[in-house]
């Protein structure tokens, strides 16, 4: 007999899924005044971290800052629930500095659930969405497993790895989402019927082990940064920060690798059971051992999952090998001899859309009013998901209410770069944001995300009064200090005394503070020792000012390089060009260029995995070849 549908509600925007993408989409849409509902299979899985218990990292930390600058929630949640904070890549230039925190999984979920509950105009429903309703090429609503029908002007799909989810551990497999959630199979069929081009991707996660079973005396300790140096993600966070836990590093060894290789055919990855494509930049431990056969060891980062749990996460050791093999190879590692696995490592295969079927607004070209975000769009990572969620939710709300939609250009943000890569190049494997993907990375730093994006967030209605006031206050402090540095002259004697006191060779002459700050050996704190700290200037703002002044010339040069690349787009590439000899290219670019053999630079730049900086390297090599 035909199902009788019960009409249960009318909304402007419906969001399917309440993971990292769904949270930001629902929050953004409701904040813009759209009547919004978010559907999740379980209220207890809102903001769940089924993989690493951390936020941020290289390029990802910048995405979180950008999200925050636009009015998102992730930065505030990370600041409220972190256990340990570290600034990565501090020994490198400011373009790649990256904030990363260990978070308390349970507290993060609780924070996010409460944040959604406190969002005005947002309804939260625990129900599985089994289908979308489409009429004349436009989405009209959703249907739930309980025969509930909800109409909507726009729908955002943020299903994570639940869509057609299938978990593999050795030769055992079962239909499932992450962390024991059930798979969303009916929705896959509905989306296929609507004409969406779906494909299969795969990801994996390591085992969770019991703290008491680890001998930490055999591991390297990895403390967080000194409390005095800790920085928040959110531009709104003012509270002092303190590290609460330590992380640790263990290493695989030749015996670990032997056990893995002896059992490699028992991995569903190598036994042909998994058809989905895995993430290039987050390989399983068996992938690492096979692909990097010359390496004697690989690091495994041992990270706590929370303050009130004994579960430890083994970052860098994801696997889909059977449990007996997992026990054997983990126990071959120093410090893990008596390891107790609480949750085995597994691989998960899932359905996602070909992102070239999306507009730059993240709206589907196939079904109007339907938006995609997160792993559904072919990306990997909480931060990539959250950033897309905000953009999709914002645009869904604007569309539902008849407003113009937001397209972020590459030069504005990592989020703009990510979306442009997705919809222009497409993806062959789960996409991870990296600094090398942006040709504007000197200007797209984590410290100036507010300057780049908060005015845009304000214009589109996401940035509320408190954030706008804080932003304007920060800008006025920075402008006043730039003026002061431009107008203040340091006497040679004062400067030399300050340099001597700092243990530096006092070779510099005095001069205008701004000009002196361009010199590599002179820092803002050193100058401030002579002329005093500017009013309202914190160590974070001082670092930002110093970067902008020191790197002004490099930024101008980078802009010229980008223009040169554009001019050379019609340059032909010889058919016999040896990409393997071009060490400036990333390994991924070399592989894909060799495989596809593009005819010209323009074609090369459109190949997934070939970044604009790879194109620049190629352009230089072709120019050199032409001259020789």
Question: Model-derived features: where do they sit?
Answer:
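Glycine-/small-residue-rich beta->alpha transition segments that form the dinucleotide
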Residues: 154, 159-163, 321, 334
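Core beta-strand elements of the Rossmann-like FAD/NAD(P) dinucleotide-binding domain
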Residues: 9, 145-154
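Extended, charge-enriched "interface" segments that sit outside catalytic cores
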Residues: 437, 443-445, 449, 454-616, ...
